[in-house]
């Protein structure tokens, strides 16, 4: 009996080794198509940007840059590129897909292109098991669904790490690829990749000959060529905002330091890895692989991955400000370190897939969180099921007979945020100027006479917004009413100037469209 059990175990190990060692194109193509099908399904059931993150801000910024580019307004384009809080490189990545239309969907198509690039990298370097574990991380498949820099960050980190895997900096072309990956990555998101890709070259530089140092200088020059102009402006404009957050912690949109009650902040990123970034099963397996790598004799490629992970984790742990997004790129080197104990892969992948069904599809809620809230505070939602919302946008826009020039938008709904509604209106009428009552009260007052259409998401029984209702929204967005022009009064008193051309129930409220009377 014992011999039979050993034989069955050996057969299982052999089958597992064979399956996860296969590096066939068919494996990658099938996995890629399944991932894309799920991506399309999820987006079809989730019509609004992610309400937990800054996605709507990134979408708006991308639209602004694209509109100025198409209009040939070089001065405005340059101003937007070099005065924005986020690097403009991230928005430029989506310019090819925006050729098919200025829409949220076109921006998200960029992530599909990056996903294809990741598949190619893992295929070329024969890492099928690492790719599968990587895709099962909530921090990865959640970031893939949003137009935010996190997924692009992971892509460029993978490009840089794979460039260092075989010869390190001994090959000048690979050193140049590393430098460009770091430079473009820094233009995708603020500074994040610096703490991952820069330490990754330490094993290559240790006792290295002069030629390696020359190649390193070439890589650094490529990085500076990509980043110097933007970061000069960035530090001049935002250094006063950055320094307090390093020492004091998170500061909200009202300028107030957020109180975070975490009894063990030193373990925040470790617990976040197991909770929301990789999940308990895949995350535990990754940490076991990390320990095994540290315990055993290491080659230069493994040292590179360790230096791409450990210094960054230490740096962000020492920072007072904590965010799970900062260490999301760490999932790349952790996945690439998963080369031992292959016999456990079927169980880990199976449990990781069950976790994916909960967070990625909403089939169940068991295991969506693993730790007490205080242990992972501040907790960020990195992945979630689709909202299944339905908004009658197409029916509403179909009632517009003449092309609008100035559109005012107001949302008093907790589900359909005004920023989301503005983006949808901009998609439908790309040549119109769209303003929000709450997001741009000063501009709304200044151009109020030019407004020809008014979109309002209100309560189920309302027929027109009231002064009190608008003021409540402004106060909720941290405005001081005595410092604002009379936008609430202007909108509330303008009912006689508009006629309603569309009204329909929408989720928990009613969506209205008004046009100015002739």
Give the positions of each predicted feature.
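Short acidic/glycine- and proline-prone juxtamembrane loop motifs at membrane-interface regions
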Residues: 142-153, 323-324
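Membrane-embedded, lumen/periplasm-facing catalytic core of multi-pass transferases
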Residues: 350-414
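Loop-to-helix entry region of an early transmembrane alpha helix in multi-pass inner-membrane enzymes
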Residues: 78, 84, 88-95, 99-117, ...
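Transmembrane-lumen/periplasm boundary regions of multi-pass, lipid-linked membrane glycan transferases
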Residues: 61, 196-197, 203-297, 313, ...
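Membrane-interface alpha helices of multi-pass inner-membrane proteins
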Residues: 174-190, 201, 225, 310-317
């Amino acid at each position: 009996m014992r011999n039979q059990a050993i034989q069955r175990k050996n057969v299982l190990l052999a089958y597992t080794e064979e399956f996860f060692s296969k590096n066939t194109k068919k494996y990658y193509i099938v996995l890629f198509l399944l991932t894309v099908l799920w991506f399309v399904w999820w987006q079809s059931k989730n019509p609004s940007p992610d309400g937990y993150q800054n996605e709507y801000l990134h979408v708006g910024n991308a639209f602004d840059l694209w509109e100025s580019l198409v209009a040939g307004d070089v001065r405005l384009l340059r101003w937007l590129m070099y005065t924005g809080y986020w690097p403009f490189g991230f928005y430029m990545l989506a310019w090819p897909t925006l050729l098919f239309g200025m829409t949220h969907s076109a921006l998200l198509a960029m992530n599909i292109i990056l996903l294809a690039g990741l598949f190619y990298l893992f295929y070329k370097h024969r890492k099928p098991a690492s790719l599968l574990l990587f895709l099962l991380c909530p921090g990865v498949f959640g970031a893939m669904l949003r137009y935010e820099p996190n997924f692009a960050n992971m892509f460029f980190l993978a490009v840089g790490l794979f460039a260092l895997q075989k010869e390190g900096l001994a090959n000048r072309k690979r050193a140049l690829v590393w430098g460009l990956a770091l430079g473009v990555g820094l233009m995708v998101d603020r500074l994040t990749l610096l703490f991952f890709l820069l330490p990754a070259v330490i094993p290559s530089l240790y006792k290295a000959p002069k030629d390696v140092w020359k190649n390193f200088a070439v890589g650094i020059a490529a990085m500076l060529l990509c980043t110097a102009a933007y970061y000069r402006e960035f530090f001049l404009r935002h250094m006063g905002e950055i320094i307090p957050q390093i020492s004091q912690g998170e500061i909200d949109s009202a300028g107030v330091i957020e109180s975070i009650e975490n009894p063990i902040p030193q373990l925040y990123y470790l617990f976040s890895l197991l909770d929301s970034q990789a999940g308990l099963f895949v995350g535990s397996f990754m940490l076991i692989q990390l320990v095994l790598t540290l315990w055993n004799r290491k080659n230069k490629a493994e040292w590179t991955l360790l230096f791409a992970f450990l210094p960054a984790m230490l740096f962000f742990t020492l920072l007072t400000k904590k965010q799970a997004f900062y260490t999301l790129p760490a999932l790349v080197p952790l996945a690439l370190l998963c080369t031992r104990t292959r016999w456990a892969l079927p169980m880990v992948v199976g449990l990781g897939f069950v976790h994916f069904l909960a967070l990625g599809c909403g089939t169940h809620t068991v295991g969506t969180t693993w730790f007490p809230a205080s242990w992972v505070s501040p907790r960020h939602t990195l992945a979630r099921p689709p909202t299944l919302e339905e908004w009658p946008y197409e029916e509403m826009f179909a009632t517009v007979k003449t092309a609008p020039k100035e559109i005012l938008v107001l949302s008093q709904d907790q589900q359909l945020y005004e920023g989301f509604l503005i983006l949808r209106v901009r998609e439908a009428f790309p040549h119109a100027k769209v303003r929000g009552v709450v997001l741009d009260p000063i501009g709304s007052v200044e151009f109020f006479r030019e407004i020809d259409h008014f979109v309002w998401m209100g309560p189920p029984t309302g027929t027109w917004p009231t002064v009190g209702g608008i003021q409540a929204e402004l106060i909720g967005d941290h405005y001081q009413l005595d410092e604002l022009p009379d936008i609430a009064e202007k909108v509330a008193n303008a009912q006689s100037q508009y006629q309603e051309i569309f009204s329909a129930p929408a989720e928990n409220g009613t969506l209205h469209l008004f046009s100015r009377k002739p």
